[in-house]
Every structure is written in C-alpha cells, then in structure tokens.
Design a protein with these regions (language model features):
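Composition- and surface-driven signal marking solvent-exposed, interaction-prone regions
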Residues: 377-381, 391-395, 399, 456-466, ...
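Active-site lining segments that contact anionic ligands and/or coordinate catalytic metals
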Residues: 247, 361, 374, 403, ...
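Short periplasmic/luminal acceptor-recognition loop of GT-C membrane glycosyltransferases, typified by
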Residues: 17, 470-548, 557-615
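Extracellular low-complexity, O-glycosylation-prone Ser/Thr/Pro/Gly-rich "stalks"
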Residues: 161, 439-450, 454, 593-595, ...
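Transmembrane helical bundles and short interhelical boundary loops of multi-pass, membrane-embedded
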Residues: 398-499, 503
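Membrane-integral, polyisoprenol-dependent glycosyltransferases
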Residues: 1-417, 423, 496, 545-547
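A glycine-rich phosphate-binding loop feature that marks nucleotide/adenosyl-phosphate handling sites
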Residues: 319, 464, 525-527
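Extracytoplasmic/secreted proteins, especially bacterial periplasmic and envelope-associated proteins
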Residues: 36, 40, 68-75, 245, ...
Length: 619
C-alpha cells in the first residue's frame, strides 16, 4: 500500500476538514458556556497555584473534580485572546477539527485511502462530536489524543520500533489526565491492536507492551502524584471527593460512582417507554433524559443521545464494518510468504482485533452506564468512524455479490431507521432515500457484465461510495444544522444563574462589600459559577458534593467576626422529602436562614430567601 496519497485525496481531505471546521466554528459565540469549568478557568488565570491545581474560586479553597490539563489550554487561550465564552471553546473546536485529518492518516496506513476519506468524513459530521467540540468541555481534547495515539500505534506496527509505541502510551496517559476513566474505553482495543500488529515473537511484543504500560502509568498518574508533593494545607479540597483528595475524586467520584451512581443533575420530563414524541420540537426531545441502560440504548429515537446524533453511524459501522474486517482477515491481498505480505496480513489482524474490541468495549460500557452524557461517547467516536469508513469502502468495491447484498441490506435499514428517527419524511429523509436508492442502483450496475470495464471498476464503485455516504450522512448533517441553529451544547449548566439575577447580585455585593475578603458565602460550588466568572472574587464554599459540609458553622462565624464575609447566597430551598444530600438542608444553610437577614428584595431580586446578610455582619 502506497504511503503517499494522490493529490486528489489531499484535496478531498482538505474539503472534509474545511467542512468540519465550518460545523464546529459557526455561531460558537451563541453556545451557552459551562459556568462550573469557566469559573475554574477564570480563577486559574489569577495565580500559578490556582493554575496547577485547577482552583474553582480565586481563593483556591476548592478545586475541580478532575486534573486541569485541558483547562490549562483554555487558560492559555483566554490569556492570549481575552476571556470570553468563545475563546474558552477554541481548544475544543480545534481539537475536533484536527482529529479529522489525523484519523485519515491512521486509517490510510492501516487500510486504504478510500476508507480513510470515508472515515474522516464520518467523524467530521458525527453530531455527538460536533456538539461536543462546540462546547467548553474536556472530551474533544481527549478524543484528539486518542486518535493521535492510534496513529502512533499504527506507525509502531509498521516499523516495529518501540519509540512509536512509547509515544502512544504517553499520549494515552495525557488523555487520562484530560478525562480520566472515560479514556479507558479505547485502552483494551488499542492494546490488542498493538499486540496483533507489532512484528516479532510474542515475548518481544509483550515486553514492548510492558514498557508502554509503565510509561502510560507514569504519565497518567503524574499530576495526581505531583499534588501529593504539596503540603495538605496548601492543596484545595477536590470537589466530588469524600475526603478532599484529588485521587478520591478521580477514581471514586469520576470512576466507580459514574458506573453505578444516580446522576445528581436535574432531570426533565421522565422518559416513558413506548410513548411517541412526533409533536415535540428537537430541543424539547433533547430535554428528555437519556434512555435508561439497555442493549438498544445507543439507538434510541429521542433524547440528547438519539440515533440522529450517534446511533445511525454506529449501526452502519457495525453492519458494514464487521463483514469488512472479517473479509480483510481472510484476504490479506499479498502473498503470505514475503515480508510485505506478512506485514499486510498482520496489520489487517490488528485492525480487526483492535477496532472490534474498542467498539465492543464502548457499546457494553455505555449501554449499561448509569450516569451517561453524550460527550462521553467521544472515546468511542474514532473507532466508529474508522469502522464505518472501512466498511463503506469495502462494500462499494465492485468485487463479489456478497458485498453488494450487504450494502443493499444496510442501505435499506438506514432508510427505515432514518424515517423513524426523523418522525416523518422531511427533506433529510428524502436525501437519505435518494442516496440509498442511488447506491443500490450503482452497485447493481457495477456488477453487470455488459457494462464497460472502466465504468464497472472505477466510476461505479466511486459512485456507490458517494451515494452510500450521502445516505448515511443526511440525518447526522440534519442534526448538526439543527444543533447549530438552536445553539445546542453538551456542557453542563451547573452554577448558571439567570443573567439579570446575576447582574443584580453582583452589583449589590460590590456596593455593600466593604473590606470583606470574600464576595459571598455560597451554598455550593455548583450554584455560584456564573458569579465567579463575572467578578473573579474569592467565595466561601459552604458544602461540597452530596451536601458534605465544607465550611462549618463555627468557621463561618469566625470569618464573619473577622469581617471577611458579610453575605450568603442560597440558591435553593430545603424541601423535607429532599433533605438527604440536599445542600440547602445542610447545617450551615439552616443556620444562615435561621439567623441571617433576607436582603433579596433590597438587591432587586424577584424572589426571596436567596441573598442573606449574615448574622453579626455590619449592615
């Protein structure tokens, strides 16, 4: 297989990458920010101490629940271009764009140029990836690092050199530092890929993988280990942890609890199996919680993880990719007796085993995961796009009736599934249908003996591939355009305040602050992010995750007596049936309501019992 792509491939890749850039850049200034992580970026830009630990608020009493590696990029962007919602999203945007040509390079080396272009196109238009890249979350950067690691492993398999493999391991270690256990989804598949694809005897390959594992662990745990070198009293309390430890937050809060825990975030209309939602707008369907764990969860018709955004491409990747990988195992394409033939056969085995395990791991995990967000599928997206590209290129070939039958069956399934996803027959479905019918017709044409050889061997297969990609991409592109038009984000709203309320609270606190060090005592970090973003002033955090008391009543009274804090912001009420795990029902919150003075009306707020003058603080 030639390693130098023809000019037309580079031109097509340029068009695909440009399209990916358009989908990720248009209107990103209108996409809602993530107040929680944006507050951390704001605080991290104030000092090197805050920068290293990922401090949530300027005084660095608490830190975010993850290593702040991705946020370091956002801080750099804000320092260079100014702090804004747009500049904070740029690292994610460019990560999503860069992943497209990187995936092309990887798939071209391990399969073919045609498959690589199809894979790059599939990733470029995948709605889950587009939406995540337009949001200021960490997942896009993690995905880019995983794709880079895949490319490095492919190079290691080609050359047999350990340096490429060790570089891949270090890259995956960085991916762990960006999004922790989410990056584990790719690990089993990439390990299988490396073992099957590396040349040499099994013992040598195992030794290489052992060395790579050591590098991975060293890089993955580097930040967590570095935090232990700082005295405990100088380390912020890690939000989400049960003991303030960043290790606990990483492996418990973001590990075991994610697999089986109940999401603490507010839910909207409860999903009802069997209910039809044709009358709902797409934005209303997005507010329906993700379908509960099940074998068909990733193919759901509704919700923020509907088949429009991921399931359709996943289905095509399975229907076309599996037979393509199996066929690749049976037909290496070269004589097995020469070195080139052995290398080719070895790469095909690595692709089949590695991508198969990667996709299987992701499907099993995300189908059963209790607390699932669409952005988590970034760890699976490259494998799905690669399998789809390989499968589409294989099926579009003019060779064999089996390929034509598989392609025709897949396109029929795509047309039926697309109609169900779109709740009727809008333009996107007609495009899907036209692409499916065109692909089937051209596949039949390519296999007619009366058709000239040039048409059968070149033009018809190219047309089949284009028609197939049109059929597959119509629904995802429809979802992309809808998400751009409606400013969909996959970032959280934790810490968001109504804009007018935020303005009034900020103005009142500035006018009545005096010389207090802390702007306000907040019920929790999850309620005050917007104010930190706007004012960048220290905050007293009363409770951590699950209403664990972080600032005791005695400590709060001490701060009041010292004149360091005068006001409290309690953005929720204590309902009796929700008292367990509710920060509004914590001891500090009850004490503020019992002894403080409600000044919400004086601040101009439309609701009461939100802003409080603390007892003992001068009026």
């Amino acid at each position: 297989m030639s390693r130098l792509a023809p000019r037309y491939e580079w031109a097509l890749l340029g068009l695909i990458t440009a399209g990916a850039a358009v989908l990720r850049l248009v209107g990103i200034g209108h996409v809602a920010p993530d107040p929680f992580y944006d507050a951390a970026v704001r605080s991290m830009g104030l000092s090197w101490h805050n920068f290293f630990f990922g401090a949530f608020e300027p005084a660095a009493s608490v830190s975010i629940d993850k290593p702040p590696v991705d946020l370091w990029l956002q801080v750099a962007s804000a320092k260079l271009l100014g702090f804004s919602s747009t500049t904070l999203k740029l690292p994610e945007v460019f990560a999503g764009i860069a992943a497209v040509p990187l995936l092309y390079l990887a798939v071209r080396r391990m399969w073919s140029g045609t498959a690589a272009l199809a894979a790059a196109f599939a990733l470029a238009v995948l709605p889950v990836e587009v939406i995540t890249s337009r949001s200021d979350t960490m997942d896009g950067v993690m995905m880019l690092l995983i794709v880079l690691a895949l490319l490095l492993i492919v190079r290691a398999c080609e050359t047999g050199g350990s340096a490429w493999l060790l570089a891949a391991a270090a890259t995956l270690g960085l991916a762990f530092n960006v999004k922790l256990l989410e990056s584990f989804v790719a690990l089993p598949g990439l390990a299988v890929f490396a073992y099957l694809g590396l040349p040499g005897r099994p013992r040598r390959r195992l030794l290489q993988l052992g060395a790579a594992s050591a590098v991975y662990v060293a890089v993955a745990l580097s930040w967590l280990t570095a935090t232990l070198l700082v005295p405990a009293h100088d380390r912020p309390y890690a939000i989400g942890s049960s003991n303030g430890s960043a290790w606990n937050a990483a492996f418990v809060f973001n590990g075991t609890e994610r697999l089986g825990g109940k999401s603490p975030e507010p839910q909207f209309t409860v999903y009802e199996p069997g209910r039809h939602y044709p009358e709902a707008t797409q934005s209303e369907r997005d507010r329906i919680p993700i379908v509960p764990p099940s074998a068909t969860r990733l193919l759901a018709r509704i919700g923020p993880l509907s088949g429009q955004r991921f399931g359709l491409e996943l289905l095509v990747a399975l229907l076309l990719g599996i037979p393509a990988l199996v066929s690749g195992l049976r037909q290496s394409g070269y004589g097995e007796d020469d070195a080139q033939g052995k290398a080719h056969a070895r790469m095909r085995r690595a692709v089949a085993g590695g991508l198969g395990v990667w996709v299987l791991t992701g499907i099993v995990l995300f189908s059963d995961m209790a607390r699932l967000h669409p952005r988590y599928l970034e760890a699976l997206a490259p494998a799905v796009a690669a399998m789809l590209g390989i499968g589409a290129a294989w099926a579009a070939s003019a060779r064999g009736r089996l390929r034509g039958a598989v392609l025709a069956g897949t396109l029929v399934v795509v047309a039926i599934y697309a109609e169900r996803l779109l709740y009727g027959a809008p333009i996107a479905w007609w495009v899907t249908l036209a692409g499916a019918l065109g692909g089937i017709a051209l596949a039949v044409l390519a296999r007619l003996p009366s058709v000239p050889e040039g048409v059968r061997s070149v033009l018809a297969p190219a047309g089949v591939l284009v028609a197939t990609l049109i059929a597959v991409a119509a629904v995802p592109l429809h979802a992309d355009i809808t998400s751009i038009r409606t400013h969909v984000t996959d970032a959280g709203y934790v810490g968001a305040l109504p804009i007018e309320e935020q303005r009034l609270v900020s103005a009142y606190l500035r006018a009545h602050q005096g010389r207090a060090r802390y702007e306000v005592a907040a019920l929790s970090a999850t309620q005050i992010g917007s104010l930190v973003v706007q004012d960048a002033r220290p905050i007293v955090i009363l409770t951590s995750y699950n209403a664990r008391v972080f600032t005791s009543i005695a400590k709060l009274r001490h701060l009041i007596a010292q004149g360091k804090v005068r006001y409290a912001f309690l953005n929720s009420n204590c309902a009796g049936h929700l008292s367990s795990g509710n920060a509004a029902c914590s001891a500090p919150a009850r004490w503020v309501r019992a002894h403080g003075t409600d000044v919400s009306a004086q601040a101009g707020l439309s609701r009461g019992k939100v802003l409080w003058l603390l007892p003992g603080a001068p009026a």
